[in-house]
Amino acid sequence: MIANVDLHIHSRFSGGTSKDMNVENILKYGKLKGLNIIGTGDCTHPDYLEEIKQYKDRELILTTEIEDKNRVHHLILLPSISKVEELREILKKYSKDIDKEGRPRVSIGGAELLEIVRDVGGLIGPAHCVPPDTLLILENGFKRIVDIKVGDKVLTHENRFKKVEKVYKRRYIGDIIKIKVRYFPEEIILTPEHPVYAIKTEKRCDGSHGICKFNCLTQYTNPSCKKRYRKYKREWIIAKDLKVGDVIVYPIPNRVRDIKYLSLDKYLSNIKREFCRSRIPEKIEVSEEFCRLVGYFLSEGYCFRDGIGFALGENEKKIIDDIEYLMKKIFNLKPKIRDDGRSEGIELKYYSRVLRDFFGDMFYCGDEKRAWNKALPNEFLYLPKNKQLQIFIGWWRGDKGVTTSEILMNQLRLISLRLGFIITFSKHVPKNPKIGDREVIKYHARWQGRVSILDEKIVDELKNEDIKLPKKDVRYGWIKGNYLYAPIIRIGREYYDGFVYNLEVEDDSSYVTVSGTLHNCFTPWTSLYKSFDSIYDCYNKKPDFVELGLSADTDMADMIPELRDLPFLSNSDAHSYHPHRLGREFNQIEVDYIGGIEDNFEQIKKAIKHNKIIANYGLDPKLGKYHLTACSKCHTRFKLEDAKKYNWKCPKCGGSIKKGVLSRVEELSDGKIEHPKFRPPYYKLIPLAEMISLTIGKGIFTKAVQSLWEEFIKKYGNEIEVLINADIDELSKIHPKVAETINLFRKGKIYIYPGGGGEYGKISFKPQKVEWYREEVTLDRWLKQ
């Protein structure tokens, strides 16, 4: 007989899983889906194992997922309850959370775990911690973790720069933790088990709101103050153990590298006219005055075809005079002043292509010379403090703490910390206005900064610049040595289905993001290839099977030569019993009969060992959020060669381009799709609820969709029967349009626009053509060809 089998799900004892995922519901909704044998998931959890014992004669098979020391996840099938208990006892000495976590971690590698599992008679194979947008501090600037490469030097918790030795990536489905830290606009977003460099704090001893800290004034007036802060220590704390009021420890780079002069030779050599060359000096001194001019350019400056300009308000007389003075002194240039009287704006325009090229190269981070691409050269992050203060003063005078450049925002915050204060930025996302019936899309957020004092020494200098300081002398955080101590003000959780990343860093085993300090921690089936060059490097021998995961099908997996002689399993990895989750991927397996958990293990084992997997059913990989290489901001799709050409920076909006799973598979492949003779067909599925939703134009959780789904199930017993076997004419009696959608699906005429850059693929009735990025041909580019 042929059984529909889903071997990989999770119970309520795993993070990010529905609290209703108990054995009774798993069996009930598995039957409605059309599953004949279902993996229990999480069978190593002691409370869940006791629950499973009550259902040992039902259509279940004992399964669990375990994460090893390399953060590779393994799907494990076990023969009996006694063998689960035996495995638990062996793994207790390698695991701290096997008694409390449904998906435990162990301190051994895949090879050791394989031997242990096989010793108890089980089967094992690879299954499917920071999200990809996380921005890190590098020696040469900032970079998103998705773009980090081996050899890059990142800032560590020891306040030094160390090389990245490995980059890990895995698909993660479950809860992620979002930690909001005072002074930082970006939350720290990470998996619950990821260690964070922090301090566990205690409450104030006088009973008032707040934490005990070394800069608390009460200690000087309250004789009974216990000064509990003296016991504080910096340590690595698991993210899920942090609480509001605990303090994040953030290293402040203290390196100083002065720059005396900048050469303009390469820009001058492009100018043919001697007169133009003679006006501009061949090198300029990087003085405090030049740094203040840089600040003005970052706030008010721009490049145009024939030079640079500054756009100011007519009430900014002091700034206008200062810019004119600085440009004359440094570059020997006078402006053409544009003041047409029709607005309150004044433009200072300096006609010099030398300066256009110089400022364009130095103070932008992309091809487009626009406000949202402005940035400081990385070398300027280590200038002496007196020069960095002038950059800040020029920028603040011009824009009063506002920027649309995320990179510049992070650079200025880092500079402010070096100076003894911090610019706290708040993010303002523009609404999309309309012109008539047409919506105008705005991609660029605005960052509004305000100054918070952390070091008394800087106060007078800021006051002299009329910079608005907080009215009350309330200092929630503090700087001590070369570290900022910033309290956590909010912690939340959110369901996440996508890729997460992690780094292995030499010596210090840590890295600093723009909002926190994280430890090495980590894994999808692609993640194994991030941790190892080969599946055999992980296990030292062949595993029993490979789980495809939601982002791959057999065509993609068989592009990798070493996988071609291994059985493939397609499972749902469901975290809830909803029919569009449970059984969304499953296997058709030939078995002699369906019994209890012990009999079912023997049947599945025999099928895996003797090529009795009849078919794999799963989602079309195009539906995945990261199938194609695409921009994470505007979701423009890129061909791999174009993404590399633009250095993984979107030329359209300045966002980060993320490498797609398909691109990664192609890198690992030998260029062929070769299926072995025993490989069963892979059938692409779309859950019934999603097809109903597409047909009637209602959300998947709406009453209308749910009612129709129940009608189909009431007549046919389960969803798989509806999708694969039911007669279309009979389906039409329930709902003709949904029946037509199912018919189109069976004929392969439901189309998908592939996902990418964090955007899910979209199903459609119409054929979809991928809109790849195409470089706009401007007159300037055409002339350069």
From Swiss-Prot:
Query: Which InterPro entries does the entry mention?
Result: CHP00375 (IPR005287), Hint_dom_C (IPR003586), Hint_dom_N (IPR003587), Hint_dom_sf (IPR036844), Homing_endonucl (IPR027434), INTEIN (IPR006142), Intein_C (IPR030934), Intein_endonuc_central (IPR004042)
- GO terms for biological process? intein-mediated protein splicing
**Transmembrane annotation, as ranges:** none
Keyword check for Membrane: no
User: CDD domains this protein is in?
Assistant: Hint, PfuEndoQ-like
Q: How is it modified after translation?
A: This protein undergoes a protein self splicing that involves a post-translational excision of the intervening region (intein) followed by peptide ligation.
Its Gene Ontology molecular function terms?
endonuclease activity
- DOD-type homing endonuclease domain spans which residues? 293-421
Task: Quote the Gene3D superfamilies the UniProt record gives.
Answer: Hedgehog/Intein (Hint) domain, Homing endonucleases
What keywords tag this UniProt record?
Autocatalytic cleavage, Protein splicing
What this protein is called in its record is Uncharacterized protein MJ0043
State the organism named in the record: Methanocaldococcus jannaschii (strain ATCC 43067 / DSM 2661 / JAL-1 / JCM 10045 / NBRC 100440) (Methanococcus jannaschii)
